[in-house]
């Protein structure tokens, strides 16, 4: 039986392990944290990610802990709508709505698909040592494996955006399922969770590394005067349910996702800004494609060559599209520039938003052998 070592026990690593086991590999997941991640706020998975989960055999289990998202749109801080998303039309084309989860619930659903002895926690893999037929580097945006394989690559760089994420402690009534508000160099978004609580994020331009002693008070200062229900969402959130992190991306594309028999997946390969909401879905696509090619190609090397050939162009295009979306959306500053953008969005038909989503979420997964 072929063996694989997966470095990293996040969503990308767990999904890769599930896929490899489904095509007959023996897999061990190595995670630095002493306890596999139950932290985090919310996360959304688009139709392509849901199709990947179905191929991996965990789609139903994941849907059971997620909330299918209906309508939504973009508005300005005063509350006026710039555009609406026809979620039903998008779901008809894509075959699935967007699902939103507590990250911890999605993580647990993936973990439950793996035997306990597959997961090894509290270990640090300082360097890639070939003790398996394949090493899957799923160790995130600041991947050590990537740095070892491509020492001349500049690595992840700060994208100019910092993000605060929270989850309300009780259900909060919202007008739509997916609500996104664009201001000047700032964005506030929210999605409904399965139990009626709301996951929210506040993204804004800031210098790298700036932190605040009272994060919720800072959010109230920045966003408390924006339209309802934003003040209510902040008021319904406990300080312990708030996370703050800077956004990093691989602005310089990697020359390859494969070196010898080490393959990079997820953020280790193609870290992107969150402005398209495609990060998790692209990692899930990676997992399916890697397993499918290893199950169908004659040799491991041929499978990895195919993975690199097919995944690198698609994911790097998504990285670029996410960056561009952020530049014209959340990151845009200047009264004239913002007014021009808003006017352009108002006269754009709602079908354009559906087309923009479909461009990256429409994906036909390969079958697992």
Segments from the language model and where they lie:
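Beta1/beta-strand and adjacent pyrophosphate-binding region of the FAD-binding site
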Residues: 1-12
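C-terminal helical "tail/cap" subdomain of flavin- and related membrane-associated enzymes
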Residues: 1-2, 64, 232, 276-277, ...
